Amino acid sequence: MTTSGALFPSLVPGSRGASNKYLVEFRAGKMSLKGTTVTPDKRKGLVYIQQTDDSLIHFCWKDRTSGNVEDDLIIFPDDCEFKRVPQCPSGRVYVLKFKAGSKRLFFWMQEPKTDQDEEHCRKVNEYLNNPPMPGALGASGSSGHELSALGGEGGLQSLLGNMSHSQLMQLIGPAGLGGLGGLGALTGPGLASLLGSSGPPGSSSSSSSRSQSAAVTPSSTTSSTRATPAPSAPAAASATSPSPAPSSGNGASTAASPTQPIQLSDLQSILATMNVPAGPAGGQQVDLASVLTPEIMAPILANADVQERLLPYLPSGESLPQTADEIQNTLTSPQFQQALGMFSAALASGQLGPLMCQFGLPAEAVEAANKGDVEAFAKAMQNNAKPEQKEGDTKDKKDEEEDMSLD
């Protein structure tokens, strides 16, 4: 089984936890391809799709008798397509076809009834190409960043509450979005200390989230015959639909002094009391994910100073070198864009004011957050950062003059 890392890895080292509920599941056997002929593997199997804690979508097949998961593929939107094979006489053979390369995986339906075959196929394609927003399972499969995507209770809490310090810094920390033009001030000086983060995040073995999905498919030694699936298993089952996880919030948190580090438990408590509306409150909503496009970020990320500040916060591991190219890959990854879209929607909801106050941000920024005015919030943070930038420039100039006087 082959897996790859992501921008937001599981919080438990070495763990890739997931919800007990699968997004979609149905009984199906595998088929082996030899030349132009496919042969059914008569073992009882289960095809299922699940979203792990790192928000990645996994397409899996397991042996129902042994319980062994033999195929576990990490799929990104537009990687592949699941469709029926019309050449099969029974009409119950489906193929997972990758758009890049010639990789194909064949399966034959083992459900006793055929009436759900097309529905299962539709759901597979929906979840593979339009993964649900983190914490909003059970909502529509749309991959957009509308405020409604925050879904029921716990959507926002699940996203931010499950992030480590370093992950939060990637969203709003001085070494995360810091330096990105006018929006760089979303960070604010000293936010790292407020979050209790004193250094780069710990290492975690991972690989590029943009890499092609891969899996090791066990070889099957069976005689080659035309595709004729074995009879379906007699037992009945139905696909389980995901349901939103209940909110784990425990009420409002006590106000912390701006000089005290804010822990993740404080963030969870604050977010637990929020009521994110199902739609925009009115007016034009600014989506940071649509603002920070690859075209806009490219010249900024070409700046060596910006690269130097961002590199320590990249996921690290043997298969993922910390390079300038990986900065681009990370900031354009689906996971980062999803998180950025949700943060933008939450900010526009007008309910992040108390949280920004906890960060010790300037009054103008807190007021803008209370109003849900993303543009005013960015300007307030930018204006707040200018005096410190001038102070730094003055200090550098003074040091330069001292060096010259020594000469």
UniProtKB/Swiss-Prot annotation:
Residues 387-398 have a biased composition (Basic and acidic residues). PANTHER family: ADHESION REGULATING MOLECULE 1 110 KDA CELL MEMBRANE GLYCOPROTEIN, PROTEASOMAL UBIQUITIN RECEPTOR ADRM1. InterPro entries: DEUBAD_dom, Rpn13/ADRM1, Rpn13/ADRM1_Pru, Rpn13/ADRM1_Pru_sf, RPN13_DEUBAD, RPN13_DEUBAD_sf. PROSITE patterns: DEUBAD, PRU. The Pru (pleckstrin-like receptor for ubiquitin) domain mediates interactions with PSMD1 and ubiquitin. Preferential binding to the proximal subunit of 'Lys-48'-linked diubiquitin allows UCHL5 access to the distal subunit. The modification Phosphotyrosine is found at residue 127. Residues 194-259, 379-407 are annotated as: Disordered. Its main location: cytoplasm. Residues 18-131 form the Pru domain. This is Proteasomal ubiquitin receptor ADRM1. One of its GO terms (cellular component) is cytosol. Ubiquitinated by UBE3C in response to proteotoxic stress. There is a cross-link at residue 34 (Glycyl lysine isopeptide (Lys-Gly) (interchain with G-Cter in ubiquitin)). Keywords: Acetylation, Cytoplasm, Isopeptide bond, Nucleus, Phosphoprotein, Proteasome, Ubl conjugation. The modification Phosphoserine is found at residues 15, 140, 211, 405. Component of the 26S proteasome, a multiprotein complex involved in the ATP-dependent degradation of ubiquitinated proteins. This complex plays a key role in the maintenance of protein homeostasis by removing misfolded or damaged proteins, which could impair cellular functions, and by removing proteins whose functions are no longer required. Therefore, the proteasome participates in numerous cellular processes, including cell cycle progression, apoptosis, or DNA damage repair. Within the complex, functions as a proteasomal ubiquitin receptor. The keyword Transmembrane helix does not apply. GO terms for biological process: proteasome assembly; proteasome-mediated ubiquitin-dependent protein catabolic process; transcription elongation by RNA polymerase II. It is found in: Cytoplasm; Nucleus. Residues 277-391 form the DEUBAD domain. GO terms for molecular function: endopeptidase activator activity; molecular function inhibitor activity; protease binding; proteasome binding. Disulfide bonds: none annotated. Residues 253-407 are annotated as: Interaction with UCHL5. Component of the 19S proteasome regulatory particle complex. The 26S proteasome consists of a 20S core particle (CP) and two 19S regulatory subunits (RP). Interacts with the proteasomal scaffolding protein PSMD1. Interacts with deubiquitinase UCHL5; this interaction activates the auto-inhibited UCHL5 by deoligomerizing it. Interacts with UBQLN2 and ubiquitin. The modification Phosphothreonine is found at residue 217.
